[in-house]
Amino acid sequence: MRYEHLKTDYYNFGTHEDEVCRDYGDWFPTASLSMPLGNVQLSLSYRRDIERPNYSNLSSYTVYINRYTYQSGNPYLKPMYIHSLVLNCAYKWMNMTVNYSRINDAPTMSTEPYPGYDDPLVSLIRPINTRDDYNQLLLHIALRPVIGCWHPYWSAYVIFRDYKSPCADGSTITLNHPYASFAWQNDIELPRHWRLSLMAQWLPKGDTNNFRITRSVFNSFVGVQRDISLRSLGSLTADLRCYDPFETAKDEGIIFGIRELTSKNPARRTFMLNLTWKFNEARSKYRGSGAGEKQKARM
């Protein structure tokens, strides 16, 4: 059992606004049970958790996107509460998870007419809380064997939701098409500290919150990494990757809300070089960890 208390004061140009201020005191119970069944490890757990909005999403500051679109935060945004019941099953390099969640006040991006504008084409995008709570069921399976220098990773998951969203005509739509992902990643250890990475992922049509995917997507990347020893200075890792080499990651969808938007993103072949310098890997100096990590992450 965990208790959290958080108090936030909100000022608008120096004026204290009681309606936007927050004072939360919440209990977060957890319970878990685990047991072996032969060579299979089973666990069942329940927990209640909270996800507070990022501070940027609580700002009333408005950003210009283009002549028809503005974006802002929402100081009235409330945190999201999640009740989760998780069954996990593990056997050697295989893992299966079944996760049922009841989600309250989930945040979503809403597109609305811009207040004060006569042009009906001008829109304001801002985060809001969903009007209706919804259920979510996640089924996930992962296989991670080791075959010599080859480290394959197969994963598949499907998510079922009964998410409700308002429509432009004033009606309500239930977005309950399953959202799925099938991925195959390969890491191959090569001589002289070289590594080769290959990944392919298929995303079929489906619904994720208020976004309906109307076109299947195929993602892939190929990469090569090299570890370089810098002796007393640590080590340097060079990671060169090509994302979407076949330019197949085209996605299309519909964003439901007070205003409905059609989204189309073309495929783009992208190259990325990442250099990572690691030093003090032995952690000889105490770096500590604070109790405010979640609050810092919200920034």
What do the PLM-derived regions correspond to, one by one?
Residues E19-C21, I50-N104, S123-L138, P266-R269:
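Outer-membrane beta-barrel signature, preferentially recognizing the C-terminal barrel domain
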Residues I228-M299:
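C-terminal beta-signal and adjacent terminal beta-strands/loops
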Residues A31-M35, L44, L85-Y91, L139-P145, ...:
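Residues on the lipid-exposed face of transmembrane beta-strands in outer-membrane beta-barrel proteins
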Residues M1-P36, A156-F160, S181-G206:
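Surface-exposed extracellular loop regions of Gram-negative outer-membrane beta-barrel proteins
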Residues V158, Y163, F182-S232, R241, ...:
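C-terminal beta-barrel architecture of Gram-negative outer-membrane proteins
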Residues Y3-D9, M35-N39, Y46-R52, T62, ...:
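Transmembrane beta-strands of outer-membrane beta-barrel pores
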Residues D9-E17, Y55-V63, Y68-Q71, R102, ...:
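Outer-membrane beta-barrel translocator domains and adjoining extracellular loop/strand segments
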Residues K78, N95-S155, F160-Q185:
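Outer membrane beta-barrel strand-and-loop segments of large Gram-negative receptors
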